[in-house]
């Protein structure tokens, strides 16, 4: 049994080492000759007009969060629907409670205005 853990440990160490090597190689091998032209933001070859760094609206984050919640619901709902007949009444009640919890969350997000575009 300890052989299995040793194999997992070795695989973990190798995976971490490969990631570290891949992250450090560009820093070690890339040329380091910063010139003012390279440090300017690129906008299709045109000079920038106004501020280059603009704020990011948090509404997009809220949309992504709500989308992720309902996407996860779909991931859980699909296998349940495929094996609905074998699972019985308990699984139906469990999935009903799951959907009710998600609908309450959706209602709360709607009530708080998280789903308004602007």
Curated annotation (Swiss-Prot):
Gene3D superfamilies: NADH:ubiquinone/plastoquinone oxidoreductase, chain 3. This is NADH-quinone oxidoreductase subunit A. One of its GO terms (cellular component) is plasma membrane. HAMAP family: NDH1_NuoA. It comes from the Bacteria. The gene is nuoA. Disulfide bonds: none annotated. It catalyses: a quinone + NADH + 5 H(+)(in) = a quinol + NAD(+) + 4 H(+)(out). The chain crosses the membrane at residues 5-25, 61-81, 90-110. NDH-1 is composed of 14 different subunits. Subunits NuoA, H, J, K, L, M, N constitute the membrane sector of the complex. GO terms for molecular function: NADH dehydrogenase (ubiquinone) activity; NADH:ubiquinone reductase (non-electrogenic) activity; quinone binding.
